C-alpha cells in the first residue's frame, strides 16, 4: 500500500514570564521561610519554561522538555496556589490556528497550553516518521495515539477553554484526526504483511469512519479555525479509506462466491476514489489505488458474465463494511511507563516544601502498611506459639534424647546444685555474727539504762531542793522538761525489743540449717558437690545415682540394654525407626518455622522501602476521595508474601497432626512405657533433692541479707543512742547550772535579810544610848564608820535578776521573791526564759539526734539549737514555780527594782531595859556559777550584762572553796 502524507497540529506560542519573584514572595509570606534559600529552585523552574519555548516540533527531546515542565507544574500546584488571588502571574499564549493572544492568571491555562503543545509535538513527530521502516512505523503509530490521549486529557479536564484551539469541538476534531491517522498507519502495516482481505476491509472502514467524523467536525463546529487545506485532506482521506474498505471487502466477497456483491463494491470503490481526487498530494496514491480497482472490476465482470451469472446489486443495497478499531488514545498516565516519569520529570524542585495534604495521605498509607505488618506478625507469632505449646505438651525433643539413650539415664549432679555449694564455700559460720549483734544490743541497752538513771537522779535532786526551800525553789519540775527524752528512751527500748524478735527468728533459722550449711560449705571447698548429691539421692530413695568419676552407687540397679537395640515383630517398626520418623517430622517443622520467619522479614523490609509519594503527587487530583481504593491497589504488591505465610501455617498444621500420631504410637510401645515409668520415678526423686537444697540455699541468702540488715540497724542505733546520751548530758548540765544559780540567789537573799536585821538592831541601840545619855544631843551626830546607817542607804549591791528596760541598766538590789508570780499576764521580756524540754523534737527511728553543742561561755546559743540555759547572759532567773508552765518575769513594779521587806520593830516585843546582843558576823555570800568569763547578751531582747563577778562580787579562792563545799549540786559533776 502506498503511504499517504499525514497531518500534524501546529504549536501554540507564548511570551516570556518571570517565576522567581512571585514564588519568593509567597514563600516568605505563607511558609515563613527565607526565600533566599530557594534561589536555585526558583531559577530552575524559570529556566525550564524558557527551554520549553524553544522545544523542537518533531523530536522526542522537545516532547520531553515540555513534559518535564508540565510535571514540575503539577508538583508546583501542590505547594503554590497560582491564580489571581495568590501568586499572580499573567500567562499569555497565542492560538495555534488563529494566532490570537490570550492571557490568564490561572495555572490550569498554562498546563492546558503545555499539554496542547505536547500533543502537537507528538503529532509532528509521528507525521515525519519514515513508515517504510519498521521502527518508524511503530513510532508513528504510538505517537499518533499518544497525541490523541493528550488531546483527550484536555477535553476531559479543561472545560472552559479561553481560546479557540482549546475548545472542546476543536480538540475533539483533533482527536479524530490523530486516531484516524494511527488507524491508517496500522492498516499500512497489515497490508504490507498481506493479511486477509476481510480483516483489512474492517481496518480501512474504521479509518474512513474517523476521517468522516473529523470532516463533519471541521465543517459544523470549527469553521474558520482550521486551514482550508485541512478540510480538503480530511475529506479526501475519508473517501479514499472508504474506497480501500470497499476494495478489500469486494475481494472478501469474491472469495466467498458473492461475485455480484463484489462487483458492486468495486464499483463503489471506484466512485470513492474519483471523489478523493480533490487533493493534489493524494492524486498519485488515489490513481494507483483506482487502477487496481478498475482492473479487478473488469476481471470480476468478465468472470460473472461468463461463469457465475450473479445479479449485481445497486449501491444502496450494499451492506456497510464492518469496522475494526486498531487505534486508541493513550492516556497521560500510560505515556511514560515505570522509571521514565522520574527520569524525564526529574526530582521535585521544591521537595523541601512538603504540602500537608500529601503528607497526610502518605501517613494514612503508612498506617495501612503498619496494619498489614501487625496482622501478619500476629499470625506468625500465633503459629510459633502453637508449635511451641504442642512440642512442650509432647515433651519434644527432650524426651527423644531420653529414648535414644535408654531410660536409665546417668543422674549426675545438677549444675545449679554445684553452683550453690561453691557460693557457700569460704563463708564463715554465722555464730560470730550473732555474738557481735548481741554485744551491740547490750551496749545500746546499757546506754539507755544510764540515760534513765541520770534523768532519775536529776529529778530526785530537784525535788529534794524544792522540799528543802519550799516556794523559794522555783525551778521548773524536771518531769515536765524531760518527758521527750524519756519518751525517746522508751521508743528505743521498744525498737530494740522488736529487733531482738527478728534476731531470734534469724538465729532459729541458723540453728535449723546449720548442719546443712556446713555440708554444702565443705562440699564446695573440697569440690565434692557430686558426692553430697549422691548421698542426698540415696537418702531420697534413688538407686541410680552416679558420680562424675563414672562409679555407680552401691544401690544402682542392673544396667539393661538400650531401647534402640530391641527389635519386635517383623511386621512392626522398631523403636529406632519410630524415633527416626519423629525426628524427621521435627526437622520439617523447624524448617517451616525458619522459612516463615524469613518470609516475614522480607515482607517487613519490602513494606519499609515502599514509597508511593510520587504516585500521590502525580495523581493528587485524580485520587481525591478515592484514597482507600488506591491503598488497596498498592497493597496488592505484598500479596505473594502473605500467601507464602499462609501456606507455611497450613503445612505446620499438617506436620503437627502427623507428629502427634507417630509420637503417640511410639509412647504406646510396652517397653517404652515400662522404662518411662522408671525414669519418671528417678526424676521425682531428683526434683525432691533439688527442692530441699533450694530451700537451704534460699535460707542461706536470707540469713546473709538479714544479718547485714541487723548490722546496719544496730550501727545506726548506736549512733542514735549516742546522740540521745549527749542530749541527756546537755539537759542535766543546763539544769545543774540553773539550779546552782537559783541556790546562790536564795542564799544571797537570806544573807541580805540578816544584814538588814543587824542594821536595825544597831539603830535601835544607838537611839537607846542617846536617850540614856545625860549629855545634850548635838545638832548632827555622824555615825561611826563601823556602823553605817541602813535607813537611807541600800544594802551592798548584789547583781539582781531584774528585767531592765531597753537601754537602761538594772540597779543592783537584793530581790524580793513573792510566792506567787503572775508575770505571765504582762508579757514582760525575760532575762532568761528556757522553754520546757518538750521543745526537743524526737527524731524518727534510725535517725540520730542533733549533736549537742558543748556549752561555751561568751557565745550566744543559736535559736535553732536545743534547750541550753547556759548559753544565755548571766544572771539568769530561776525556773517558775510548779504552778507555772513557762517562765515569766516578776510582777510590778516594772522599774526593775525589788522593795525589801520592812524590818520588824523589836521594841514592841522586848521588855523594858533589854539590851540586844551584838549582831552576828555577816555570812559570806557564794556566787553561782563561778566567774570564768564574760556572759554575752542572748537572743530575745536581753540587755547587755556586765561581766559577772566584778567589784564587790569578786570572790577569793577560799570563798570559792567554801561555796563549793556547801553546794548540793556539786555531786552532779560526776554525771558527765
Swiss-Prot record:
Location of the region described as Disordered in the Swiss-Prot/TrEMBL record: 743-762, 769-976
Q: Please, one GO biological process term?
A: protein transport to vacuole involved in ubiquitin-dependent protein catabolic process via the multivesicular body sorting pathway
Query: BRO1 domain: from which residue to which, for each copy?
Result: 5-387
Q: Where is the composition biased (Low complexity)?
A: 775-792, 851-862, 884-895
Task: State the coiled-coil residue ranges.
Answer: 748-775
Pfam families attached here?
ALIX_LYPXL_bnd, BRO1
Name one cellular component (GO) term.
endosome
CDD domains, sorted: BRO1_ScBro1_like, V_ScBro1_like
Q: Where is the composition biased (Basic and acidic residues)?
A: 746-762
* Location(s), subcellular: Cytoplasm; Endosome
Here the segments flagged for biased composition (Pro residues) are 914-937
Keywords per UniProt: Coiled coil, Cytoplasm, Endosome, Protein transport, Transport
Source organism, top-level taxon: Eukaryota
The UniProt family comment states: Belongs to the BRO1 family.
**The protein's role, per its UniProt record:** Involved in concentration and sorting of cargo proteins of the multivesicular body (MVB) for incorporation into intralumenal vesicles.
Query: What is the name of this protein?
Result: Vacuolar protein-sorting protein bro1
Give the organism, scientific name: Aspergillus fumigatus (strain ATCC MYA-4609 / CBS 101355 / FGSC A1100 / Af293) (Neosartorya fumigata)
Q: Gene symbol?
A: bro1
